Amino acid sequence: QMKLANDGFTQAVDTAETNAVPGWARWRTEVFGFALEPVVMLISKKDFANLPVPRTRHEMLALIRNNSSIFKDRIGTYNPETSGAGYLFSTQDARQSDTFWRLAEVMGRLNAKLYCCTSKMIEAVDKGDLALAYNLLGSYANAILPANSNAQIIAFEDYTHILLRTAIVPITSQNPAGGIRFLNFLISSDGQSILDTEAKLPALNNSVIDKLANRKPIRLDSGLLVFLDRLKKAHFLREWNAALIQN
């Protein structure tokens, strides 16, 4: 949606509701965040029964490196070549910390499995096929996992990326006035309450997410467009393949 707006395919929406959206959760007057998605780790309780739960990526790196017999073939993460979310999370990790590339190399040596989507990783951890899944959407896991699940959600303490679900009004909309009304409702107090309590999509002011240690919202700014450049994306994916896939 950022690229669509940058390329001129979205309408400006200037209302009291859109003006109330925090600056980090909107881009110009065209792209607006309406819900939050913490990016988390999922662990298998059975596999971690006698292991310390890592709270930072440095701890995760040391843990999987020192327990290769447990984690060999049993770590999952997004495939950034086929998943837009996976590419976004990987590039944000790389921007945030050099640990990402060391982590990718170790996961590669342990033959990490690559996935298209969060739901597949959740299922694999819950069944015990994976011991750990890295960088998946927390709200999906909260919505899908039963109370007695084998899977446990872990939010890192060094930093937790927060993905923004966003909305736009396309210039091709056949009912732009209706689109603006719906957008205004999404980001209104009533709309945010419904998203938070009924749709199970954390609202922009969600109190649980607000308390996460070192939360890092993926801000809607021009930095997101950098990695959409064709040459930069190709370079990043080459580095990724060299680190993780290690062909």
For each feature predicted by the language model, list its residue ranges:
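A ligand-binding cleft/hinge motif common to bilobed small-molecule-binding domains
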Residues: 1-3, 126, 131-150
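Extracellular/periplasmic bilobal clamshell ligand-binding domains
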Residues: 211-247
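Extracytoplasmic ligand-binding site segments that recognize negatively charged/polar headgroups
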Residues: 1-126
